[in-house]
Amino acid sequence: MASNQPNNGEQDEQLAKQTSKLSMSAKAPTFTPKAAPFIPSFQRPGFVPVNNIAGGYPYAQYTGQGQNSNSPHPTKSYQQYYQKPTGNTVDEDKSRVPDFSKKKSFVPPKPAIPKGKVLSLGGNTSAPKSTKPISISLGGTKAPTTTKPAAPAAQSKTETPAPKVTSESTKKETAAPPPQETPTKSADAELAKTPSAPAAALKKAAEAAEPATVTEDATDLQNEVDQELLKDMYGKEHVNIVFIGHVDAGKSTLGGNILFLTGMVDKRTMEKIEREAKEAGKESWYLSWALDSTSEEREKGKTVEVGRAYFETEHRRFSLLDAPGHKGYVTNMINGASQADIGVLVISARRGEFEAGFERGGQTREHAVLARTQGINHLVVVINKMDEPSVQWSEERYKECVDKLSMFLRRVAGYNSKTDVKYMPVSAYTGQNVKDRVDSSVCPWYQGPSLLEYLDSMTHLERKVNAPFIMPIASKYKDLGTILEGKIEAGSIKKNSNVLVMPINQTLEVTAIYDEADEEISSSICGDQVRLRVRGDDSDVQTGYVLTSTKNPVHATTRFIAQIAILELPSILTTGYSCVMHIHTAVEEVSFAKLLHKLDKTNRKSKKPPMFATKGMKIIAELETQTPVCMERFEDYQYMGRFTLRDQGTTVAVGKVVKILD
């Protein structure tokens, strides 16, 4: 009996007929027997992309495959590949087929107007300040931005974009087609007269667009840097002061009391020092022990080395240098004075002590002269010990001391009594008129400021911040490396920078900078008292050498011409005379090679060279040293061009460098 069920071939034909009558909607299930696996059209070989104005993928792609898009398949489904389609997305209602007939006819978008070319000079890629675009014509006259070029007749009516200009790195530009209308003249069009505009024309065009020139920017930046450098780490100006004067005038006592009154030495430490001084039988010296720290200085009551301390006022920071007042330590005093900006000349008003220090043999005169020759142009004269029973804040005694000092400082030392010198009475031991003004009941005749009040309100000092770096070496010692100490006379220094040691031409690297408070800092400027840790071959570096800029080193010479004023001389001075020269921190033996001229009171030179020189004369001479010494002309750098001559413990002359011969 034959089976009524159709065979496999007949079933396929029936299913095919049914399938052909199905509508192909968004969810219409389709099936083609023995069809190939589903492969999206864009993955088939030879696929050519066609712009789909409706966005997304066209639905007709499934009809050719004969597969249900929702059926499982080895390849990934359409939803997995296109979960976040780009461009226009299909409506979320998948059952609705998009009606493309309602879409407007597609019109290609107009090409965007080319943006103005921005020329970047000096690596600055930031946008120009002006919002007006800059157009540079490279093929003759420039087309105006408001006129559109006419399209060629062979092309469609759609607007043709302007030709593109290649980047500046290729250095090749395509000339723009000439416009039909006559353009307006501009500075940019006049600059571009050749097919390839020169670099100079491009640079001028960019400068015309930006009003601020490179030179102005550099000047403003330099001014900002200078202002930042002049602001110290605490926002206060740094000043170096040195206490000078005859032995036992009260320099160390005054310095110790300043440290206590400014809080640099706390009360507990001061009580400990006072207790130690009382046990040693020197109770009245306890304030000076804050600076005189060595056993020799405390035992003898005399300062030997230059004491160093640091204190602050409201507007300034101070490095205090306590110079020895004994005659045998004048060399140390010169070393301290060479690093100071302001000198404090301490005078004892006690009967007999003032006369001993000011008359012949005392150090008051010599210290005042040395301070002037070492570049201390402002002197504060402190009349100390006004509380002594022999004085008792006497106005008569105060004026007596001031009158004698003012005459000497004006005639011999060269200070102007009205502008360069300030006098004030104090009591270093009791602290009266040191920080706070003396009470009117104690001293009714003095109405001026106290010592610290005056130092804090002085006019600002001149600093050569922009000059090449110069720092004479005041001391050298080992502390986890080599430490070089001194005062920066010009310029500035930064950590990890290189410096040149003159006169030996040795390069060193600055690995660390420490200020007067022993704190490490990244940079320092002129006027600061610093310690530099250096790296390199420093075996030959010694005190008196100069750290300087590697690009602009100081001069080092063995022969120079100087103008000299003779102060004290036991005999006559002739050719071949030798003595010791103190210049900045260097100490070197020098000899007179030639006596060139004698100067009269008006500084007029004599026609014939003098045979000899005596006390009170001014001469011009040629001097020689055995080894090179760092120096500069006095008119160029005063602190590197002035010197002092000493012989047998006496200051015989002072001078300034006029000309460097080598």
Swiss-Prot record:
Primary residence: cytoplasm
Region G4, residue ranges: 384-387
Region (G5) location: 427-429
Function: GTPase component of the eRF1-eRF3-GTP ternary complex, a ternary complex that mediates translation termination in response to the termination codons. Sup35/eRF3 mediates sup45/ERF1 delivery to stop codons: The eRF1-eRF3-GTP complex binds to a stop codon in the ribosomal A-site. GTP hydrolysis by sup35/eRF3 induces a conformational change that leads to its dissociation, permitting sup45/eRF1 to accommodate fully in the A-site.
Gene Ontology BP terms: cytoplasmic translational termination; nuclear-transcribed mRNA catabolic process, deadenylation-dependent decay; translation
Region (G2): 301-305
Region described as G3: spans on this chain: 322-325
A GO MF term: translation release factor activity
The keyword GTP-binding is assigned to this record: yes
Coiled-coil residue windows: none
Subcellular location per the Swiss-Prot or TrEMBL entry: Cytoplasm
Subunit structure: Component of the eRF1-eRF3-GTP ternary complex, composed of sup45/eRF1, sup35/eRF3 and GTP.
Listed result of changing Y577A: Reduced interaction with sup45/eRF1
Chain spans, region Disordered: 1-220
Low complexity bias (residue ranges): 26-40, 141-158, 192-213
The organism's place on the tree of life at top rank: Eukaryota
Organism (species): Schizosaccharomyces pombe (strain 972 / ATCC 24843) (Fission yeast)
InterPro entries: G_TR_CS, GTP-eEF1A_C, P-loop_NTPase, Sup35, T_Tr_GTP-bd_dom, TRAFAC_GTPase_members, Transl_B-barrel_sf, Transl_elong_EF1A/Init_IF2_C
Biased composition range(s): Basic and acidic residues: 91-102
Swiss-Prot/TrEMBL keywords: Cytoplasm, GTP-binding, Hydrolase, Nucleotide-binding, Phosphoprotein, Protein biosynthesis, Repeat
Gene of this entry: sup35
Segments of skewed composition (Polar residues): 62-89, 122-134
Binding site for GTP: G245, H246, V247, D248, A249, G250, K251, S252, N384, K385, M386, D387, A428, Y429
A cellular component term, taken from the record's GO annotations: translation release factor complex
Protein name in UniProt: Eukaryotic peptide chain release factor GTP-binding subunit
Residues where Phosphothreonine is found: T182
